[in-house]
Each structure stands twice: as structure tokens, then as C-alpha cells.
């Protein structure tokens, strides 16, 4: 049993040899794609930040790293949805976005960052533009 426990422990808690060699190649191999990918993500980031800052009640700072933004929805807290529900917090806001516009976001409280919410920009420019337009429309409908 002791030997089986050791084998099982090593099998599930350690990185496999093939994964280790793949990581070595990824780190030491051709890096030419990184600059072009960085540029694409900067363009997507800038698009999302700009469009979210145009939405009523939202403010979005430009992140330095990662592939997501954390806009503040403090400006929509206390507002009413078209069906009369009051947005009381960031969780209410992301539920409202999902239910009315089909846009999925994560409420900031899940990360200890209320009243913010998290949006990934690791999607195509077309999808991001559409999602941001939907968010703008949802914010404009609040009173």
C-alpha cells in the first residue's frame, strides 16, 4: 500500500516528463510570434477599454498585463433595469448583462474587487466589439 501511495502521489502531483520537455522547447524555441501576438492583444485591450469607458456609468483603466480588464460599475449601482430591478452590486450588474444582452462577465466580488467586474479580451476583435456594444446598450437602458 505504501508503494502504491507513493506511485499515485508522484503520478498526480508532479508535472509529467513530456510536459517538462514541452515547456523547455516553448521557452527556448522560436519566439518571433510573441511580438505580433502582443500587438494584437494591445489593440484588443485598447478597443475594450475605450468602448467600456463610453458606456454610461462605467470606468475602465488600462491594464498593464493580463488579458482581461476590471471596469468599475460603481456608476450603475442604484440604477434600475427596464423591468424595475435595482442594481445593488456588481453581481447584480453582471447578471443583468447576461440576462439582457447575453454578455458573460465575472463580478468583482469573486476576486475581492467590488464594485468591479472582469471581462476577458482574449477573443476576436469582432466578438469584443459586439460585446462592448451590448454592454453600452445595457448601461444606456438603466435609469
Task: Pin down the residues of each PLM region.
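PLP-dependent class I/II
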Residues: 1-143
